[in-house]
Amino acid sequence: MRYEDLTRKVGPLEFTRITRDVFRSRSALRDTLARNNPGRPLTLPPIDFNRREVFLVAAGPRSSTGYDLRIVSLRDEGDRIVVTVHERTPSLGDPVRARVTYPFRLIAFPRSDKPVKLKWPGRP
């Protein structure tokens, strides 16, 4: 399935724990972002929730700039949508800076109202 990555459009956000959720309304998305980022100004791009839904996956805090999340695939499996994510972790010697980062991905895709399942190899 095709999707749009909205991560850069919402700016830097900080999710202090592993988070995964699907949003079918602007208010639900805004509430979750505000609850996880108190006091931080939020910027939401235009999203037509009549036609699209949004999925959030966040890794929680990481110790350097070498971590990142990547959407590997988004598949409609008939009775559900499956989002597969890969977390990039730094190797010894990678040019990274030691500081707390909060990798996340926020994607929009055609609305289906099917359950959305996260497949994140190596994570519960």
Which residues make up each language-model segment?
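Exposed, flexible binding/inhibitory loops of compact, secreted disulfide-stabilized domains
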Residues: 1-124
